[in-house]
Design a protein with these regions (language model features):
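ATP-binding N-lobe of GHMP and related small-molecule kinases
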Residues: 1-86, 100, 104, 108-110
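A generic local secondary-structure boundary/capping motif
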Residues: 18-21, 120-130, 147-153, 198, ...
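Glycine-rich beta-alpha junction loops
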Residues: 26, 36, 136, 164-169, ...
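Short beta-strand-to-loop capping motifs
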Residues: 34, 165, 255-259
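Gly/Ser-rich oxyanion-binding loop with an adjacent helix/lid
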Residues: 70-148
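Active-site rim beta-loop-alpha module in soluble metabolic enzymes
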Residues: 164-224
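Glycine-rich, charge-dense phosphate/pyrophosphate-binding loop(s)
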Residues: 201-265
């Protein structure tokens, strides 16, 4: 049996829509072992699909298929702390767990880049799947089946605080709220801030983060789906947050704070 620990992720980070993400200290732990049948359970008694529709199983089988290996079944034991449909990369975490677990069971025929490419190809969001694999702060894009990515060190003086509401918001619904055409000015607005965000996090220019997490492409359309979302962002900043934004498609909100201010915020 192998164990895979995968972190939650926060994608977009305001200005970096579909391109920037960071791993958080909230984890799913998944145990996998080969079996002659499918045996899937959850340690906490939560409902999980117990057949071939289980995402972890599907992704594990994809690895076996890619490597030309037969798979009769798997034992999968899930211990998941990442809440589903809250904008914290729960689907990416399951995708990565299935791929990495199967790869470990097979003796790691896929190298790290192949794992990253396959996860993004299956999941469709390299800004979630890449930091889920590499950890830390990542910039990533998927092109022709290959993920071009950079893992960048983050200045050590900050923490990330996550506000997780008690309601769900599907990625499909959040994406449906977005316009099909964007204004050139809005594109430039985000491009400048995404570059500033990456540079500021890595150099410690923390005074830039409020501006750098600004966004015109997705948050203005999604706040209407998140009760009190804009109020939470405003209040977090009033209490000293350096920046705040919708995590992924929402509805969770993330605030960037100085280390030591986490409990206060």
């Amino acid at each position: 049996m192998v164990r895979v620990t995968v972190p939650a992720t926060s994608a977009n980070m305001g200005s970096g829509y579909d391109s920037i993400g960071i791993a958080l200290e909230l984890y799913n732990m998944i145990d996998l072992a080969e079996n002659d049948h499918i045996d899937i359970s959850d340690k906490n008694g939560q409902y999980v699909p117990q057949d071939e529709s289980n995402l972890i199983y599907q992704c594990a089988k994809r690895v076996y298929d890619e490597c030309g290996k037969p798979l009769s079944g798997l034992t999968i034991v899930e211990d998941c702390a990442i809440p589903q449909t809250r904008g914290l990369g729960s689907s990416s975490a399951c995708t990565v767990a299935g791929i990495m677990g199967a790869n470990m069971l097979l003796g790691e025929p896929l190298d790290r880049n192949a794992v990253i490419d396959l996860a993004a190809t299956i999941e469709g969001h390299p800004d979630n799947s890449t930091p889920a694999i590499l950890g830390g702060f990542c910039v990533a894009l998927l092109e022709n089946g290959h993920v071009h990515h950079v893992r960048v060190p983050v200045h050590g003086a900050i923490d990330f605080v996550v506000f997780i509401p008690d309601f769900q918001l599907s990625t499909e619904k959040a994406r449906a709220a977005l316009p099909k055409i964007i204004d050139h000015h809005d594109a430039v607005y985000n491009l400048a801030r995404a570059a500033l965000l990456a540079g500021s996090l890595t150099t410690g220019k923390l005074e830039n983060l409020d501006v750098a997490t600004g966004d015109c492409l997705h948050q203005p359309y999604r706040f209407g789906l998140i009760e009190n979302g804009e109020d939470i962002v405003r209040e977090a900043k009033k209490l000293g947050a350096l920046g705040a934004f919708i995590s992924g498609a929402g509805p969770s909100i993330v605030a960037i704070v100085y280390k030591g201010d986490r409990d206060y915020i």
